[in-house]
Design a protein with these regions (language model features):
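Juxtamembrane helix-loop transition sites at the ends of transmembrane segments
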Residues: 1, 20-21, 128, 226
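Bacterial N-terminal signal peptides
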Residues: 11-21
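Extracytoplasmic cell-surface/polysaccharide-interacting catalytic and binding patches
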Residues: 26-108, 118-121, 125-211, 220-232
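Segments that shape or occlude catalytic/ligand-binding pockets
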Residues: 111
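Short, well-ordered surface patches within globular domains
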Residues: 114
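Conserved metal-phosphate-binding beta-hairpin within the catalytic cores
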Residues: 216
């Protein structure tokens, strides 16, 4: 009886190990080629470092300002380790202030070949002022030193920020939000939410972009060019 029980336990253990191996293989297969390349280059997966941060890559869908899918295989958000440490700090501070909220990342490290696809889509249009030209070295996303981000509930529902993320217009600017409220282009609550987002991101060490409430850089372009490398 004991021998049969021992054999049964052994078989169950083998089946468990086999199922775990299959799951590991499937997980590796699901990870995109771009994700593996970013990891090899030393960039870190945001969700692996801090699972409490929500991720929804907007360029993995067509509902972005370009109107097309730019990330064919990338589903995960990556950052330079220094930027990731700053983001983790910002998330922790947000949790201190508002335990019911979380940061939600819409874009992070962006390979330069994706930047080229984006530029080709908008060049010679009114939108090209919002996109860094790869011929000029690209932008901070191309160093893994920038995030497009918002606030959300613990379920992932985004808060009112006045405009959709990726909205190209003056209502997305952060330097005249009081006027935007007076003109009823954004609500007082949206202004409050933007201010909270900037507060926690600045605490983490990020620099807001004047024309996009959702965009934050970890360092200046000059610093990035001097000390960091572009993601090909």
């Amino acid at each position: 009886m004991k021998m049969r029980r021992h054999r049964l336990v052994s078989r169950l253990a083998c089946l468990l190990l086999l199922s775990c191996s299959v799951i590991s293989v499937e997980a590796a297969q699901k990870e995109s080629q771009t994700a593996r390349k970013l990891a090899r280059e030393g960039y870190v997966n945001i969700r692996e470092v801090d699972p409490s941060i929500h991720v929804s890559l907007m360029y993995g869908r067509a509902d972005n300002f370009c109107g097309v899918v730019l990330y064919d295989d990338l589903k995960e958000a990556f950052l330079h380790p220094e930027a990731m440490a700053a983001l983790k700090k910002a998330q922790a501070y947000l949790k201190q202030l508002r335990p019911d909220l979380s940061l939600k990342v819409y874009d992070a490290a962006r390979p330069m070949h994706i930047q080229q696809k984006m530029w080709d889509k908008v060049k010679h249009t009114e939108k090209d002022i919002y996109v860094s030209n790869p011929a000029h070295g690209g932008g901070m996303h191309n160093y893994g030193m920038a995030v497009d981000i918002t606030l959300c509930t613990l379920k992932g529902d985004t808060l009112d920020m006045g405009t959709k993320i990726d909205y190209m217009g003056s209502a997305a600017h952060i330097d005249h939000e009081d006027r935007l409220v007076e003109e009823k282009k954004i609500s007082k609550k949206a202004r409050e939410n933007r201010q909270l987002l900037r507060k926690v991101m600045r605490y983490g060490g990020f620099i807001p972009l004047r024309t996009e409430w959702w965009h934050f850089n970890k360092c200046s372009r000059a610093t990035a060019k001097k000390y960091y490398k572009v993601i090909p």
